[in-house]
């Protein structure tokens, strides 16, 4: 039987849709690891989650809302809006809610950036800033961070007529460092009025240095300052993705015009309201970090490791470059002992590891494993 002749497909069928210019050049976000070979329940110190878990009030509120999962949520998040406004003494109409802070940051990029514009950020800044900017075909200007700290003169010196956004992580991730009150005001005052200063304050609640400034007082009267916050860290709601921004009214209006209409679920909104109401859980979470962060810093320093002073719920640790003692080898060693930490080579810090402040038994196990590593 004669087989049919198979001809080449027409040219049209070989053409496929391609992403717009620049998309495939973007390096995707790299999350912290969650698995360690040979351990069913490893100690995860790689993602800066709340090590105490979640507020019982948040859990109860989530479960109570579960019978409404067939309904669309309130698009304006009115109850959550009122709760956040009351908790932080803010004007409710100046709040924008998102599917985690990530969405809020992307909204800012979409609102302000055109091809050829640029953003300014520190060289160790959160990679989502650059991802969002490049998706808008904007340029990214990364400024040096001497001593693991943002340089206000360097940031101001990178601003030009095409700069639309300046991103500051306050405190920084993965560094844990921060701009002092004087530095923050100098940066804000030095920016042209058409440039938006964005303070990403995912870790702000953990800061206890008297020179730390959360920026809310400044933002109340500023027309170009946006502050973002999250329920993922202190409040332990990372799985539910609830973030928000406090903006000048005209910026809030622009962001609301393009955000997804139902971007925070009923269960997430109710859990966030419950979390805000649980002052005891918040206090306990802060007390835990503020007790064990200095302990970790001291113990790691005692092993001959350099620890960057941190105002977050993690520490950044620098390892020697000597063979057998590097950060990459330490990360492998810790994983072999059931401890997952975060390598930060993708932030330009190949000699460092970022380590979340864990429970007491986690912290002691970490120090014991690293003591063995450094002495082998």
Descriptions of predicted regions:
Residues 134, 150-161, 174-197, 201-234:
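Active-site pre-lysine segment of PLP-dependent enzymes
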Residues 73, 78-118:
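Phosphate-binding glycine-rich loop
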Residues 224-308:
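PLP-dependent aminotransferase class I/II
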Residues 290, 301-337, 353:
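Conserved PLP-binding catalytic core of the aspartate aminotransferase-like
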Residues 91-95, 115-118, 162, 194, ...:
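Short acidic capping loops at alpha-helix termini that bridge into adjacent secondary structure
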Residues 2-5, 182, 325, 329, ...:
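PLP-dependent enzyme catalytic core of the Aspartate aminotransferase-like
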Residues 2-71:
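N-terminal "arm"/small-domain region of PLP-dependent enzymes with the aminotransferase-like
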Residues 111-168:
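PLP-dependent aminotransferase-like
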């Amino acid at each position: 039987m004669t087989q049919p002749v198979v001809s080449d497909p027409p040219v049209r069928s070989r053409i496929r849709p391609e992403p717009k210019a620049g998309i495939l050049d973007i390096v995707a976000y790299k999350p912290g690891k969650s698995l360690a070979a040979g351990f069913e329940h490893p100690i995860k110190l790689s993602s800066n989650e709340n090590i105490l878990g979640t507020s019982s009030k948040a859990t109860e509120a989530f479960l109570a809302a579960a019978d409404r999962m067939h309904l669309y949520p309130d698009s304006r998040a009115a109850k959550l809006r009122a709760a956040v406004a009351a908790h932080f003494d803010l004007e409710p109409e100046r709040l924008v809610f998102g599917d985690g802070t990530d969405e809020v940051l992307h909204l800012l990029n979409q609102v302000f950036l055109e091809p050829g514009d640029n953003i300014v950020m520190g060289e160790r800044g959160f990679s989502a800033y650059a991802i969002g900017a490049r998706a808008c075909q904007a340029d990214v200007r990364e400024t040096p961070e001497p001593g693991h700290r943002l340089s206000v003169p360097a940031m101001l010196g990178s601003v030009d007529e095409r700069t639309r956004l300046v991103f500051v992580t306050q405190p920084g991730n993965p560094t844990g460092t921060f701009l002092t009150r004087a530095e923050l005001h100098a940066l804000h005052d030095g920016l042209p009025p058409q440039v938006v200063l964005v303070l990403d304050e995912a870790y702000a609640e953990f800061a206890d240095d008297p020179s730390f400034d959360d920026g809310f007082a400044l933002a109340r009267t500023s027309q170009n300052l946006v502050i973002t916050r999250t329920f993922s860290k202190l409040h332990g709601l990372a799985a539910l993705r609830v973030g928000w921004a406090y903006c000048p009214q005209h910026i809030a209006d622009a962001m609301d015009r393009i955000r997804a209409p139902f971007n925070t679920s009923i269960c997430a909104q109710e859990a966030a309201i419950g979390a805000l109401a649980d002052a005891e859980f918040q206090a306990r979470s802060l007390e835990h970090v503020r007790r064990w962060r200095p302990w970790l810093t001291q113990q790691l320093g005692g092993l001959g490791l350099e620890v960057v002073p941190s105002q977050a719920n993690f520490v950044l640790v620098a390892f020697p470059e000597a063979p057998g003692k590097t950060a990459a080898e330490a990360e492998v060693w810790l994983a072999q002992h059931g401890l997952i930490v975060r390598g930060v080579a993708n932030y330009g810090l190949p000699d460092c590891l970022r380590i979340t402040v864990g429970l007491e038994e986690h912290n002691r196990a970490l120090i014991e494993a690293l003591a063995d590593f450094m002495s082998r």
